Amino acid sequence: MTFASFLINFYSVIPRLNFKFHWTNDVFNLEWSSEYFQALALVACLGAAVSLLLLVTIIIVWICQACHKNETTGKTRRRVRRLSTVLFIISVLCFFMLGVCLFANEHVNRGMSISINSIINTKKSYQISTAQISQFQEAALNTTVHLKNLEDTVHVESKKTKNATIVQQIDQILTNITDEIDIIAKNGKLFQAKHGDDIGKLEKIRKVLSLYESERWAFLVILLSITMVVLFTGVVAFCKQSKKGAVVFSAIGFFIFVVVWLLISISLPLTIALADFCRDGDQVTRKNLGNLYETVQFYNTCVPVTTHDNLPLPVARHVALLNNIPANKSQLDRLMEVAFNSSAAIVNSSSAVGDDITKMLKLAGAVSSSSSCYVFHDDVVNFYYGTCNQSVAGMSIYMLSILLLGVFLFILLIVVSKTWNLFSRLPNEYTEVDEDDPFFPRGVNDSTIPVDIYGTHVYNPRTRDRTEPSTNTTSGTADEPNAPLWSQNVTVPLVSNSMSRQPFMSDHPYNNYEDRYNM
C-alpha cells in the first residue's frame, strides 16, 4: 500500500452526511442537489463553525485585555523579554508552516501538471490514431469501387468462358472480399461517429484542469505571501518591543486568521472530493468520457509489449477483418488467370484491387502501431499518478500544515494581546537637521549663535559674556558700587504746595541712560 492509497482510505472514513444527518451512499456526485454535495457542504460548515468559535474566543480575550487595568508594577524587563521570545518562537513556527504550505502547493501543482501533460500527449496520440483509422476507412471505400468494377468485368468475361465451376468460385471469393471490405468501410464510419467528439472531450478536460490549477495555485501563493509579509511585520514589532507595531499586527493578523480558516473550510471538502474521485470516480468518469471510457480503461490496465496486436477491442475488430483478404485475393488471381487466360481487362481491374488491398494492409499496420497499448499506456497511467498520487499527497500535506498554521495564529493573537500594556510606545525616529537649523547650525562656531536664540536673553548665560552694558536683569547690581543706600548723597526737596519733578539719582553713573524716574 502506497502513502497515497493510505490517505485515500483515511479520507473514506470521514462520514458523508446529508442535510438530514443521514449517511449517504452517493459518492462523488457533484450535482448541486445531490446528497454528496450536501455532505461536502456540511464538512465546510464544520470548518467554518470551528473558525467562528476561535474568533469569538479571540474577541473575548481582547476585550478582557483592553479592559484590564494597566499595572506598572509587573512591567519588568524580564517579563517583556520573555514575552517577546515567546512571540518570536510562535512566529517562527508560523513561518515554517507557511513554508510547508507553499511546498505542498507546489507539490499539488506538479501533480496536476503531470496529469495535464498526459492529457495533451494522449490527445496528440489519439489524433494520430483517428487520422490513421480515417485513412483506413477511405481506402476501404476506394477498394469497394474497384471491386465493383472487377465484378462487372468478371461478369462480362464469364460469358466468353465455358468453365462455369471456376466462374462460380470466382464469384464466391469476390463476393466474400467485397463483403469484408464493405464491413470495414461501414465500421470505419461507425467508429468515427462514435468517437468523433473524443478529441473535444479531452480538450475540454484539459482546459478545465488547467484553469482550475492555475487559479488555485496563484490564489494560494498570493494569500500565503500576504500572510508571510504580515508575520514578518509582526516579528519586527516583537523584536523592537513596539506597542504600536503590536497593535497594528493584531488588527491585520485578525483578518489573516479569518482568511486562513476560510481556506481550511474550503480545502478540506476539496481534499475529500479528490480522494473520493480516486477511489470511486468511475461513475463520473464514465459520464464525462462517454464512449472513450472503455478505451481509457483498456490503456490503463493493459500491459505494453513491443508487438502491435495489443489493441482496444473496437480497433482490433476493425483491423481483424482484413486478415483473410490477402489470401482470398491470391486465390482469386489464380482462378481468374485459369478461367480468363490473363485477359487484359481482368488483369487491369485485378491490379487496381490489389493495389488498394496493399494500401489497406499498410494502413492497417499504421492503425495497429498508432493505437497499440504502449502508445497510450504511460500517458493514461501518468494522469492517474499525477491526480491520485502526487495531488492527493500534496493536498494532505497542505491540509495538515494550514491547520497547524491556523492553530499557531490563534495562539499568536491570544499572546500578542498581552503586549498592549507591556510594550512601550517607541519615540519618533531621529530626523537629520539641515544647515538652516538655528539650534544646531552646521559648520558654524558657537560664538555666532544669536544671543536672543531663546526668544529672550533672560537666563541666557551667553549674555554675561557680551560686551554690552548689563541691564541688571541677570546680575542684579553687578556694575554698581556696593555702598549702602543711606550712605549715598541723596537730597530731599522741601514740602511745598506744588510738587515739582526732580531727577532721581542725577549723579548716578548711569544717568546718561533713558531709565529715569522723576517724582
Curated annotation (Swiss-Prot):
Glycans are attached at N142, N163, N176, N328, N341, N348, N389. Residues 1-42, 104-217, 267-395 are extracellular. The keyword Transmembrane helix applies. The chain crosses the membrane at residues 43-63, 83-103, 218-238, 246-266, 396-416. Residues 459-485 are annotated as: Disordered. One of its GO terms (cellular component) is plasma membrane. Keywords: Cell membrane, Chloride, Chloride channel, Glycoprotein, Ion channel, Ion transport, Membrane, Transmembrane, Transmembrane helix, Transport. Pfam families: Tweety. GO terms for molecular function: intracellularly calcium-gated chloride channel activity; volume-sensitive chloride channel activity. Its main location: membrane. It is found in: Cell membrane. Residues 64-82, 239-245, 417-519 are cytoplasmic. It is a multi-pass membrane protein. Probable chloride channel. Belongs to the tweety family. This is Protein tweety homolog 1. The lineage of its organism: Eukaryota, Metazoa, Ecdysozoa, Nematoda, Chromadorea.
